[in-house]
Amino acid sequence: MPVSLAVCETTANVVNAALRESLGSCVARAALSADEAKTSNGGGDGSSTSGSSTDNLQSQIVANAKRVLLAKIDYEEVDNYHESVLAKLKSKYIVIKPDSNGGAASNGNGNYNGSNKTNGKFGAGNGHDNNGNGNGIVNGGTSALNGGNNRKQIVVVDHQSSNQHGSPSNPNELPKPKRVLYQREHIRIGWKQSERKWQVGTGMLNVGNTCYLNSSLQALFHIPSLANWLVSESAHLENCNISESCGSNGCIICAMAKTLQSTQSNQSAVRPFLIYSKLRQICKHMVVGRQEDAHEFLRFLIEAMEKAYLMRFRNYKELDQLVKETTPLNQIFGGYLRSEVRCLSCNHVSITFQHFQDLLLDIRKSDTLEDAFDGYFSRERLEDMGYKCEGCKKKVSATKQFSLERAPITLCIQLKRFSMMGNKLTKQISFKPRIDLSRFAARSPTAAAQPLSYRLVSMVTHLGVSQHCGHYTAIGLTETGSYYNFDDSCVRPIAMQSVCNTNAYIMFYELDVNGNGHVVAPKMNGMRLTTNGGQQHSSPVVATAPAAVVSATATSTSASVSAAAVTSPRFIGPQLPNGYGNSNGHALGGGAAKTAIQFKTTPQKHQQQQQAQTQYQLNGHINGAAKFQTGAANANANKSSCNTLNNSKQHQPQQQQQQPQHILPISSDEEEDSDDDNDNDNVKTNKAPQLPSMPKMFEESSESVALTAKLKPKTALKSLVPYESASEEEEQQQQQQQQTLQQQAATNSRKRRSGADSSDTDDDDDEEQQQQQQQQPSLILRNGHAKTNGNLLNSSSSKTKSASNASSANVNSSKQKTDAIDEIFKSLNNYKNKHRNDHNHVDDDDDDDEDEDEDEDEAQAQAEKKTVTKSSSSSSSTSLTNGWQQSQNGKATASPKTPPSPAVIKTKTGIWQVTRNDEDDDENVDGVADADDDDDNDEVAEPAVVTAKNHKNPFAAGKATATTDANPSAKRQKLLNGSSKSQQTTPRIGNGYQGESLPNGNAVVSELLKQNHRGYGSSVLSWNGKASELDKETFDLVCAKRIAGYGAAAADEHCCDVNSGHSSNYGTNYKSLNNDMSSSSSSSSSTNSSSNSSSRSNGNSSNCPPCDLLAEAREQRKRDDDDEEENEMDRGRQRKIKSASVKCGSGATAAPPGYNPFQEYESQKRWHSNKSGSYSRFYHHPNYRSNFQQRNKFKHNRFAGGGGGAKFQQQRALQRHLASGGGFTRRQHHQSSGQQQQQS
């Protein structure tokens, strides 16, 4: 036998027989021939070194034979032993002395000793070529072949290697690997290919900044091809033998498979500990507990899984790169890009191939995913003279363009949202659940006729503004066709509209082709790789597996004919396009006719016929059962006869779409088509049953707001004002009050102007009601009162008219001023007599609630409240104020002609007179008010019980300054717009100072404080000629109430309840608190002020008439002097007064059970200045900050700094106090009283 090592079987007996044969004479002769060839190549004499070389070669063969015998032989079950074992073994061995007709073989078998030199020379000459060919095979090079038999053997032995490095067959074709580790046909695409039932999957617990890990795993587990492969690794899972090198829990593939099974079997969230514990194994620089990038983790995770799979093979380190790219992970995610660089000088085209597992798309100049693909695969120009052309042999300008040589089964897309500096591009990129990449594939026209369709199966989203902070979530497609959002342990369904509007970061698209059995390599993926043989053998390969491979650039005519024969029946006639026209996807290798019959099932065809027209009109997609499928009509400009199928289905009756039993299981696909394409077709108004996880309520309501708003009284804007819905009865009362007041004021000479305003308002109501129906239809029928809600948008116009009315009203004579005051008291007296037994308490509660909600509901509440009371406001304000409409209709305008309207009240405690100390003091005519004082009081003293809706009683002992408005400018604007309902029709409109100007509603006390601090400490009030301490008493009362446990919101509520007289408990408690505080404040409250406080509380509980008259008089006073600039200045000072009062009052109380920020400031000041040891520290709780100095030594030393630090803190506190309007004497008093209470 001339061959030393022939094709060997893998059994031990065959190896031993080959070893014995190699040690015989045949081995010696063959070895001698090889040795002579080597000596001839080296230029030496063959006879001199033949003996030693033969011994050396024989010793090497014996050593290698022993190694083969001692090696462990693994057995593996294969389908075809001849093709999978013997054919592969041929590529491992080199023929030392092949058969040839040149006489070398016969001479080699002949006289060994006699013709050594001659045979050696001839053999050496022929051996040079053979050695050259052999070395070319081993090293990857190519050389000229001399003999036809030599060519045949070389091609059989290593045709793959010669193809890999540019064989003469076709250098522009993708090279073939020597060995395929995992066949592409074994990948099962789609959930339907698995035998098991796939659940939605549970969430994953976040164990500390692991949202990137959880979202990445969820996205991978919802890729059907990857999930099916992980489940199929059960045999490896049981017999994993690489746990020693990959950790105690097994390899990373086993950890992934176990984690996937746990998410499918458990009902609650799982902890991905098997993956989290191998984080350093996946990537060395990743740290447990630190935030990482999801895409980076994905890349390292897939690479670790590939390495774990390669470790199953003994010689995995010796495998070349092409073989390593045939792992299951590369078969799923891997693809090849074709790069064509064209020289602009000689038009030479250089073609290279690049392996990829994901596409990184630049979105800076794109708004849609299709635009990003166009930019990625577009032709770009390289920099001038920067490319060295192989044809020109010089640097020239060139263009470069990518195309898909082999499309992956699962396409991973990463949008470049992060820069090198960590900044994030947060622009919205719109995408569709199905994409077609046929126009980017480098394929023949025959293969290009079939669309390269992908379906969105999962995605990873990032919430945040930077790469270094944020949160990752995942979205996955389940077997039912619904999408679910996976936010760590939270799993919830998500509509297709929300999916497409998500700022995606990583997206996974899978080929939209499924099969019943083992999925073969799809024809639509544009690949040219065949797993059996090269391009020369494409014809036999297609014969054995016709649906597995279609060579797009087949070199033989038979291959092209076979490919056309397989694919042509799919596009002829109106039959369903098998493999992609329905849910079955890939075709099996059994022939075209058999495949076509196999996929013609009646239920699927019926479902497609009833949806074909709608889906084709939307985006040309053809639905399968709960799966995305793509029609061939929109594949590319290369039209095929598949359009006949779509056109024929387009003319199907539309009534088939309304069959609920067929539409229900695939409603999610209909929504995906309709929502993604944004078409206004039949699907938008389809009344077919929808899946509960994917509603279309938002889109439908947004398109038909004008229709649904008239039928639904409850709208989203109405919910922003929760107390407005219970005001129908109040609106009716206000309308009645408006009519009554107009009749009572009919004799007034100035009513003509108010009537004109009312008519103008009605006209505006009609116009603005029509405007409202067009612009804001959700408020047309808010409470069923179209008239009261018609003035939603006329705030600016109302301000303008009110300003003009006020300015015209201010040009009256002094006689008209006196008549205006008389008219005020008469109208209020008649109003109280008429509405004494009406529903007063409901309005008070509603007004209190509205005052509390003014800041957060400003925009909607202002518009709605103003709408409710605009009509009544214009007329009632004119009748009440005899033409002064400043507080009613808008902002108060300043005018020197404004009448003073003083309030002189005779009560049980004496005659009270309130004067002014502001810029308008010179213009107030107090004498006129004094002249009318007794008459007015006699008229209004009769009703003894009373206030109709006066919950802002001026004498209510409420907290006037404790609650600081969070947004004073918003409150002011709301006040000027006249948006409060009861404010404009109730007798609170006295002398101009509205109780609603402050949150607590204590109008008189707040006004007294404001006037008192105009001079920063000068008293301007007189109580029977005596200086009043009301401002200081109010500070104590307010602070006492807060310290007693009432919160800010509760204090407002209690104050309103006490003022209105509806809660006897609150009134009693507050009165007792008032009395206690009056008695405890030695320096700030006198006996007279204490009795006055008690009498005011009692008067409030009994609703005395003088209190009401005083409130009315002060409301009228406010209308006279409130202009915009003055009001703004007053509010700024008022806010300072509030801060000072709270600070002063907080130190003069006992240990508070609640929290007070100003008390915290005072306590912190005492903590910092405690080194002097003057007094013991005070804490809110016995164990609260007991070791503050020991635990915060740095802060203590930094801010306290011994005596100097305490002095500095005291000085700063004093400066803040004085700047806020407080007095020095008052501060010392409260600080000393606070120290006494703390020491006690």
Curated annotation (Swiss-Prot):
This is Ubiquitin carboxyl-terminal hydrolase 36. Residues 1111-1120 have a biased composition (Basic and acidic residues). One of its GO terms (biological process) is protein deubiquitination. Interacts with atms/PAF1, but not with CycT. It is an enzyme of class 3 (hydrolase). One of its GO terms (cellular component) is nucleolus. PANTHER family: UBIQUITIN CARBOXYL-TERMINAL HYDROLASE, UBIQUITIN CARBOXYL-TERMINAL HYDROLASE 36. The modification Phosphoserine is found at S725, S727, S895, S901. The lineage of its organism: Eukaryota, Metazoa, Ecdysozoa, Arthropoda, Hexapoda. The active site is at C211 (nucleophile), H471 (proton acceptor). One of its GO terms (molecular function) is cysteine-type deubiquitinase activity.
